[in-house]
Amino acid sequence: MGPQGPVGPQGEGVNWKIVDLNNVGSQSSPWDYSNYSDNNYYFAKFDVPALTNFVFTDGNVNGYILLTENGQTIQHSLPYVLHKYDKDASGNPIYYTETVDFVYGVGWVQIEVRDSDFAYEADEKIVPATMSFRIVMTY
């Protein structure tokens, strides 16, 4: 290997923007219900002006759910998949998976919560817990 070459010109650098979406599902930011006959889910849509056409086209957008474990806040990248257990009215076990994910477009982000049990009528009565999220845009 030869000697190191001269220092090059300074690069353009990286920009980033972090948007925290706190207490999604609370009274001030409630979940909406999709009410589709074949694929119901809960969602919350937010205006995110920093998510410009440039960020959408040439940048990167990552979503995280903020969780508390052992008294500390941690970030888990989306989608976040959680296997759950419940009982029906007769006491029989019900196993299902809850998936929390996000979709986005220019100027907005939508958080979605979907259960795999396909019990659409029941899902409308079982509202997801309040959750907090972080959206990180790099461009």
Model-derived features: positions:
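Collagen/collagen-like triple-helix recognition
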Residues: 1-17
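Conserved beta-strand and immediately adjacent loop positions that scaffold enzyme active sites
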Residues: 3, 62, 134
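Extracellular attachment/recognition segments
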Residues: 27-122
